[in-house]
Amino acid sequence: MHPCSSVLHLLLRCMRGCCRHTRSRVPRRLRRHVSYIRLIFKSLYFNSLTNSDVVTDSILEPVFWMVEVVTRWFGMVFVFLVVALTSSVVFIAYFCLLPLVLHTYSPGWMIWHICYGHWNLVMIVFHYYKATKTPPGYPPKMKTDVPFVSVCKKCIIPKPARSHHCGICKTCILKMDHHCPWLNNCVGHFNHRYFFSFCLFLTLGCMYCSVSGRHLFIDAYNTIDQLKHLEAEKQGVPVTGIGLLIGIVPSAGVAGKAVQVAQEVSQPPYTYKDRMFHKSVIYMWVLTSTVSVALGALTLWHALLITRGETSIERHINGKEAKRLAKRGRVYRNPFSYGKLNNWKVFFGVEKRSHWLTRVLLPSGHAPYGDGLTWDIYPLKKDMMPV
């Protein structure tokens, strides 16, 4: 055997003997207390059911807390932004576009634009106000006979089906979809219809402004571009892409040309009012086009959820449940879906054909189906089928 290996083997035996000797010197009673303390410490955090999702949520808990605090404190700021931006578009439409419509459009088109624009504006204002002021619905805190599926770990109260806890509102919400910072309110059972209708009619209104004002936008953009060229020539900057971007000191030849242009153009071709008109048209078109794309995508997503009879939260829950059952060879079926058309009827509260007009296309403050605690709507409302 190699001498180094023999020395190493002897050293390991000595260390093992020392450890055994030290352990034997520790009283058994002390070792028992140490084991008990270790057990108590592990009981505070150890859970055999803990998975990667729980660990991820625990790590991101400070981020969630910060988002909740910011959303809670800036809720009124978001509401103010919605009101301010919408009011600015309405102001431009009334003082810039409406006079143009009255002087250039035929009587038929003029009546159509005025009627549609005001109808759309009324629907937007009504549904936004109702979505903001209507409580989403809360589970009863007193003991009742209503069946519940679980107990909220935050509120410590029975939680009915489709109810979830909102960390921003600090309470449980009936049929919670999400907390909307633009409403400064949760979207739940009693204001879900108002929220979706607001998104739908605001999207339609922005699309209407964007499409009907596209020619005005092109004219205004070209006019502003011409004004930039004229101002650049006056200052002696070459009328090129680089010259418009970089305000350099003009050369002698360019300076002479600038003096000549300044002498020829003694009066500005457009007044301040004309400039503000063109800038307002550009602002309105860019804003409404952007909102049309962003809010339109959100509206389509919520329309898909309504068709499936689920909320944004239930979409994730149902997806996980479907994957779990798929591994067992089973198909998951949403118990709260009554069919594509019936889901829309339940959502809008449509009971007869005339309700599509009075409850969907006109402002209506009717209550939704049910109380948000139980969901046996379809067996009790079979007369909805022929609508």
UniProtKB/Swiss-Prot annotation:
Underlying gene: zdhhc16a
High-level lineage: Eukaryota, Metazoa, Chordata, Craniata, Vertebrata
PANTHER family in alphabetical order: PALMITOYLTRANSFERASE ZDHHC16 (PTHR12246)
Tissue localization of expression: Expressed in the central nervous system (CNS). Expressed in the developing forebrain, and especially in the telencephalon.
Bilayer topology annotation: Multi-pass membrane protein
KW ATP-binding (keyword) present: no
Family as reported in the entry's similarity comment: Belongs to the DHHC palmitoyltransferase family.
Function noted in UniProt: Palmitoyl acyltransferase that mediates palmitoylation of proteins and is required during embryonic heart development. Involved in the proliferation of neural stem cells by regulating the FGF/ERK pathway. Involved in the proliferation of neural stem cells by regulating the FGF/ERK pathway.
Protein's UniProt name: Palmitoyltransferase ZDHHC16A
Domain DHHC: start-end pairs: 150-200
EC numbers: 2.3.1.225
